[in-house]
């Protein structure tokens, strides 16, 4: 079910956004924060996309000026 798939990505995006910072500092902290931002962005792109099934392919469409 594609709707459930999309909802799981929304849940993942929210989980990344709300995930607590582990007790790390310096470069590791910056790397963790950067990865969290990328994870959130990736999950939101999928969850905000329109989709269609064409010739047995699941196709996501994301408007770039979102």
Residue ranges and their predicted role:
Residues 1-66:
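Compositionally biased, non-globular sequence tracts
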